[in-house]
Design a protein with these regions (language model features):
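Conserved alpha/beta-domain cores
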Residues: 1-168
């Protein structure tokens, strides 16, 4: 939005219909996502940073690396909150980072209503295949059960069970 204001001030022509979005990479952005959704067309969830900041971990530091877990319930619930707030304002949600192409999480992303997964080209075929095997309507009730799990291992096992049930 600020860039558009600057272009307007300089009298430069540009596409006024270009979608404006923001990255959701911190717990603070998650908590404000209901307010932020009023000002944008889309969210892009930066999963690598969100996991790191939510779990107080560092993927590159071997002393705390073990805390970095894509199936951490705080992370999954945070992403669900962002999706719910976005849906309430008709804001699209994408996710980037390693979790976007993590097989056990792809059905969960579909159930949450994530519109776009940003994945490495080498993983696009597998990711598309998993998406095509996934039914959002069938997985929405399962998603709530996963997010209500009492432990990360239990959530991970349920996610893996979904993949097995899908024949993946």
């Amino acid at each position: 939005a600020r860039a558009m204001e600057e272009l307007d001030q300089r009298g430069e022509a540009y596409n006024r219909e270009i979608p404006v979005g923001i990255m959701i990479e911190t717990p603070a952005a998650v908590m404000l996502s209901d307010i932020l959704a009023c000002h944008v067309d889309f969210f892009s969830i930066g999963s690598n940073d969100l996991i790191q900041y939510t779990t107080a971990s560092d993927r590159m530091n071997e002393r705390v690396q073990y805390l970095y877990d894509s199936c951490n319930l705080s992370v999954l619930r945070s992403i669900k909150l962002v999706c719910d707030n976005a849906r309430a304002r008709k804001v699209d949600v994408g996710i980037c980072g390693e979790t976007a192409s993590e097989p056990r999480l792809i059905p969960l992303w579909c159930a949450m209503g994530i519109n776009e997964l940003s994945v490495a080209p080498a993983l696009a075929g597998r990711t598309k295949y998993i998406i095509n095997q996934t039914s959002k309507a069938d997985l929405e009730p399962v998603m709530d059960a996963i997010l209500a799990q009492g432990s990360v291992p239990a959530a991970r096992e349920r996610l893996d069970q979904i993949l097995r049930e899908l024949g993946l």
